[in-house]
């Protein structure tokens, strides 16, 4: 409860403190004094406190004087209050006794009324039971009377033999029998009902027997009125299922047993289709009358139809499924996947055609919800079929990936057998010979698994050591030089079986490009198949395929790098023969060089072979990029080699000049040819210049620009400067 705030008297404005400080809950004397000392002296604080203390005393006295009369009169007003209260206790006690007595009387009355009402309710229930029993007996007697009168008419008159009259009598009996059943259920447990029950059972048996006979007669004679009266009677007694079961047993089952013959189905591949066609003929030939009466046909008139029946769903279909399961069990065997696929496809087409014979969408829904429909669908062991197909596809693909460097068969757009088999496997998943709509999700997952497996295969190839194909060829040595491959020993023969050639790397890149180029076509095929099952979320399908495509394209840079590296090594393995040029001209008295060395043509041979042999397998831009990068790398190393040779020649020349000056001999320059011709060093410079110029010409013949080859302009500048130096030294 909120505390009541006390109003303190207002002091003069000259006080050095606020009067409300005293009413705060956290008021502290020490804090109050220290706070006031900051403003005034203690003497002034004391004077203000004394002044306010006097004001408080005065206010308290005034408050007491104001309420004094009320304090004095309080005791006076309470005089005699006890006596008045005692006088009230006696009448209140009497009133309490009267109320309790009245309450007891009312409770007794309520109990009496409840007991009487309970007895009346019991009497009413017994009366209702008696009335129901009376109604049961009356209905039994009435039905028996109708039957007896009908029997007497059968003897005395031939009019009763009319099917229409018999149908009307059955409808009257059915109406009364329906009431009989209702009252019998309500009177369950009554002793008298047990005595009447045999008579009820006899009536039931007679009624069902009459209905069955009359319905069969109507169907055999195609009498619409008889069939209509029978079906209406079945509906009246709530026995529509009995009528549907009767039609299934008497009409459908013999026909199904006659049509479904296992020997006939296995005799020819198209026999299953013929069998299904004959089963579908049953509906228009034998169910036309029933469909007209029950409203399942287009020609049915609304005023004459008997609702509540669906003979196609509840009579024809269960018997067809039963016949297929019992007489044709091999139909559902998935051991032979090709035969299983053909049987399943034909069977599902039969189901769709059967659904089209249903009279309405509601009938189709009832058919799909029928237990026999689910049993038929579950009989097809699609998971086992998929596992068999999975082993076929995966086994064939793995066999090809194991022999991954084998060439593709003739006529294939791919270079390698592994790539060819990968594409064949992808196409097979969505081919008409393998695809099933209910397995679309599994086939899509298998598609992604195939692409992922091929990506792993390519990544494994990209880390294999590259076998230098050009190293296996015998290089044409320069005249008077050793075979430059002698220092390599038997390197070419040491290539392991796990290595991969640059040609095969080109095949892999080519196949990757072709596969990525054709993946959109595969996506369109997948979309067409998925539309059959109502799938609409094609964005997720496209995104998943794009991820797989990105994973494949991610291998191209590494493969291209390996190809470029191998080309560069092959090219430079010949270009480094420039180191042999000084040995060919020093102290050999050879003629002045006029043509390039043979190693230049040999160096570019791997590039020519790649361009001419595989130019149609990859895009021109990719091929040009490979050649340009390989030449840039090998030319840079060639530039370093030529620079080293020229520096060595220059150092040798300077060394000989110093030796000549030291000897001061008029002898002939040992580095000069006889007759005062070009020196050996100048011949070396000229030969290197001819080699580099020829290299540039060959590069341009391949469709490349020398300016795009890194280090080639610097190399050309280097050899031209050396040639100019040689020309300047000539007399």
UniProtKB/Swiss-Prot annotation:
It is found in: Golgi apparatus membrane. GO terms for molecular function: protein-containing complex binding. Keywords: Golgi apparatus, Membrane, Protein transport, Transport. Its main location: Golgi. It is a peripheral membrane protein. One of its GO terms (biological process) is glycosylation. Belongs to the COG2 family. This is Conserved oligomeric Golgi complex subunit 2. It comes from Mus musculus. The lineage of its organism: Eukaryota, Metazoa, Chordata, Craniata, Vertebrata. The gene is Cog2.
């Amino acid at each position: 409860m909120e505390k009541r705030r006390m109003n303190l008297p207002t002091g003069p404005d000259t006080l050095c403190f606020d009067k409300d400080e005293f009413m705060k809950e956290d008021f502290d004397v020490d804090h109050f004094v220290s706070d006031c000392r900051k403003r005034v002296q203690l003497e002034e604080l004391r004077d203000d406190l004394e002044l306010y203390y006097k004001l408080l005393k005065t206010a308290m006295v005034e408050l007491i004087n104001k309420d004094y009369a009320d304090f004095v009169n309080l005791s006076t007003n309470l005089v005699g209050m006890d006596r008045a209260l005692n006088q009230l206790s006696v009448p209140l006690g009497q009133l309490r006794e009267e109320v309790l007595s009245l309450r007891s009387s009312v409770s007794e009355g309520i109990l009496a009324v409840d007991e009487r009402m309970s007895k009346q309710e019991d009497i009413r229930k017994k009366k209702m039971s008696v009335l129901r029993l009376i109604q049961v007996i009356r209905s039994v007697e009435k039905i028996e009377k109708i039957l007896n009168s009908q029997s007497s008419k059968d003897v005395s008159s031939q009019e009763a033999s009319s099917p229409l009259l018999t149908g009307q009598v059955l409808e009257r009996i059915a109406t009364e029998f329906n009431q009989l059943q209702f009252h019998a259920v309500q009177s369950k447990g009554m002793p008298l009902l047990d005595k009447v029950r045999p008579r009820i059972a006899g009536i039931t048996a007679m009624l069902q027997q009459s209905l069955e006979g009359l319905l069969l007669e109507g169907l055999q004679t195609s009498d619409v009125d008889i069939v209509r009266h029978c079906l209406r009677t079945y509906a009246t007694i709530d026995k529509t299922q009995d009528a549907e079961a009767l039609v299934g047993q008497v009409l459908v089952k013999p026909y199904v047993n006659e049509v479904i013959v296992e020997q006939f189905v296995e005799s020819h591949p198209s026999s299953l289709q013929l069998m299904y066609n004959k089963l579908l003929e049953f509906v228009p030939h034998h169910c036309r009358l029933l469909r007209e009466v029950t409203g399942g046909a287009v020609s049915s008139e609304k005023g004459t139809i008997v609702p509540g029946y669906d003979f196609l769903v509840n009579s024809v279909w269960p018997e067809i499924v039963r016949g297929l399961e019992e007489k044709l069990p091999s139909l559902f065997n998935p051991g032979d996947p090709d035969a299983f696929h053909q049987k399943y496809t034909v069977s599902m087409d039969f189901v769709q055609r059967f659904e089209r014979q249903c009279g309405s969408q509601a009938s189709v829904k009832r058919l799909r919800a029928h237990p026999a429909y689910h049993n038929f669908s579950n009989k097809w062991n699609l998971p086992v079929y998929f596992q068999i197909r999975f082993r076929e596809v995966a086994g064939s693909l793995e066999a090809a990936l194991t022999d991954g460097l084998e060439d593709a068969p003739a006529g294939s757009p791919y270079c390698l057998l592994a790539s060819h088999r990968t594409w064949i496997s992808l196409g097979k998943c969505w081919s008409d010979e393998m695809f099933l709509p209910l397995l679309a999700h599994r086939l899509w997952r298998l598609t992604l698994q195939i692409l992922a497996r091929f990506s792993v295969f390519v990544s494994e190839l990209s880390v294999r050591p590259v076998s230098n194909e050009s190293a296996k060829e015998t290089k044409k040595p320069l005249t008077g030089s050793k075979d430059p491959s002698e220092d390599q020993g038997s390197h070419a023969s040491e290539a392991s079986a796990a290595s991969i050639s640059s040609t095969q790397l080109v095949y892999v890149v080519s196949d990757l490009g072709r596969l990525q180029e054709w993946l959109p076509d595969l996506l369109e095929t997948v979309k067409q198949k998925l539309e059959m099952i109502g799938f609409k979320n094609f964005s997720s399908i496209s995104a998943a395929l794009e991820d797989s495509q990105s994973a494949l394209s991610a291998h191209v840079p590494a493969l291209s790098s390996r190809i470029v590296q191998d080309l560069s090594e092959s090219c430079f393995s010949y270009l480094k023969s420039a180191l042999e040029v000084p040995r060919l001209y020093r102290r050999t008295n050879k003629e002045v060089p006029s043509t390039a060395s043979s190693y230049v043509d040999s160096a570019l041979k791997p590039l020519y072979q790649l361009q001419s042999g595989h130019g149609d397998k990859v895009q021109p831009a990719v091929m040009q990029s490979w050649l340009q990068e390989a030449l840039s790398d090998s030319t840079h190393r060639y530039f370093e080699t030529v620079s080293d040779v020229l520096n060595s020649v220059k150092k040798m020349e300077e060394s000989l000049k110093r030796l000549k000056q030291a000897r001061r001999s008029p002898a002939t320059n040992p580095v000069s040819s006889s007759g005062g011709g070009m020196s050996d060093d100048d011949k070396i410079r000229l030969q290197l210049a001819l080699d580099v110029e020829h290299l540039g010409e060959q590069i341009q013949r391949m469709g490349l620009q020398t300016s795009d080859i890194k280090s080639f302009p610097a190399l050309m500048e280097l050899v031209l400067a050396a040639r100019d130096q040689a020309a300047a030294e000539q007399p």
